[in-house]
Amino acid sequence: MRIAIAGTVIGTTVGITVGRTVRWWRTWGYDPGEAAKALPGDDLVPTPKGIITRGITIDAPPEAVWPWLVQMGYGRAGWYSYDRMDMQGGSAKTIVPGWQTLAIGDVMPVSPDGGFVVKVVEPGRALVLFTDTEVVESQAARAFEPSSDIPAGLAASGTILRQIPEDFAASWAFALEPLDGGRTRLIERFRIRVGSAGATFRVVGPFIGFGVFVMMQRQMVGLRARAVLTAVAPPVPAPIVTESHRPKSNGRAIEPAAQTVVVAG
């Protein structure tokens, strides 16, 4: 009897947990209108077998969000997600001027061996990344090479990369839509096409889809936190001094240092 009761309690708990997880997966950030609308980069994967579209409202204008998008990538500012999975260190908490240049054809790295190819760059509006079988295969072999620079999660992904079918393509779009009150709606869309998938890929496919959502959700929350704080941080007022009282070094007046905004946490 005790075993039966314990089993019932465990089963009920697991069922509730799974139910809540599935509901979170299906509803977080989901808007039917956004899911149906066309976004930049949709044409890169015209016949997807899977689409994930999620949105989040940010209390900051698009120009405050854009710099955080441009500097993303492994070895750069990171992905603002679960860093132990996709970064060697933590994601940046400041806007880095040296990572603010991004052009079509550049690679936004996901590991030391490569990453997504940049396909669309519309400053303040849209960023679209892309990969396909050709890109993945050129990096898959290197993913197996042991390296202290590759987190365990990335190294383990080499097995999955080897199972990518021939007809594979994926696009990852970030769209910024201005809202009233100086706010922004960030919409992310991940589209994937998988051809004649092998047995391994068919098994892990659903888990990959859930994994993409989990990382995306954390990333969007991280982007929101960073953009909001940098947008509302008040400027540091420069001291009012006369020329005769301005601090000097070697006879030259010292100008006030520029402000650096740091995200707490």
PLM segments and residue spans:
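Short, hydrophobic/aromatic-rich segments at coil-to-beta transitions
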Residues: 102, 121-129, 153-159
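Short, surface-exposed coil-to-beta transition loops
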Residues: 51-53, 112-114, 167-173
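Hydrophobic ligand-binding cavity/cleft-lining segments
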Residues: 10, 17-103, 107, 115, ...
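Membrane-penetrating hydrophobic segments
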Residues: 1-6
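Mid-length scaffold segments of soluble, non-membrane domains
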Residues: 87, 94-97, 107-131, 136-140
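A short, structured loop/turn motif at beta-sheet edges
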Residues: 59-63, 118-126, 175-185, 224-231
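Beta-strand/loop substructures that line and gate deep hydrophobic ligand-binding cavities in soluble
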Residues: 34-35, 138-217, 223-225
